[in-house]
Structure formats: structure tokens, C-alpha cells
Amino acid sequence: VESFLYQSGPACRIYLLADGSNCPAEDFLSQAAYLHPDEFAKLTKLLDHSCDHGLPKNKQKVNTLGDGLFEFKTIGGLRLIWFWDANRIILCTHGFLKKRQTTPSGELATAAKWKKAYETAKSANKVRFIEDPP
């Protein structure tokens, strides 16, 4: 498992998880920038704020999903799922455009799979933190 640095600041560092050439969070962010530029700008501002000042205490922007998973969210429906690691590291699994009130179970399962893969790789000392974007 690789993790690519996406953003960094005094409050935390945000990494995107990847497995070889597969980096779902980066794919999501690239698509969001192209297909939903206004919402992507809001998400980018939220990530900037989180790195510089810490997570907002507003459930409209950051929400817990259970099992150690969280989401950055915009009003327009962009969701970026992540979890914490030591040393104020945020690891993003993937993102999606939410269209219903509840988070689809398939999205939660995908995030849980990435989290488990990361934890397994970390316990085997097989995680690479890469400071350059994917």
C-alpha cells in the first residue's frame, strides 16, 4: 500500500491511499475538479482549512460514518471518505457523489476494505509514504 501526500499543514497531513496504479481518491478528485468545479473548490477549501486549522466542528462539513471512518462533505454532494492514523495523518480511501440521504453501504464497504488493507500493510511494515502527488 502506498500513500501519496495530497495536502499538508500544521494541523494535519492528508494522504491518498493507492495500491499500485489504483488510487481511487485521486481519480475521484480529478473527476470532481472537471465535472463539479464549484463543489470541488468547496472541498479543496475544506481540506485546506483542515490542514491549517484542524477539522471543523460542523457535521455539514465533516461527519463520522462509524468504524473509524469519516467523510469530508460539500452541500452539493461530494464526499471524500477517510480515516485517522497516528501523528495527525488523514488517509483518504475514495470519494463519490452522494445522491441520497444515507451513505450507500457499498461505499462504506469500499472504505472499510481500504482501511483494513492499510492496517494490514502497516502492521507488516509495508506502507510507503510518498511526499509527491500521484
Question: What is each residue range found by the language model?
Answer:
Residues V1-G77, A86-I90, F96-P134:
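Basic, Lys/Arg-enriched alpha-helical interface segments
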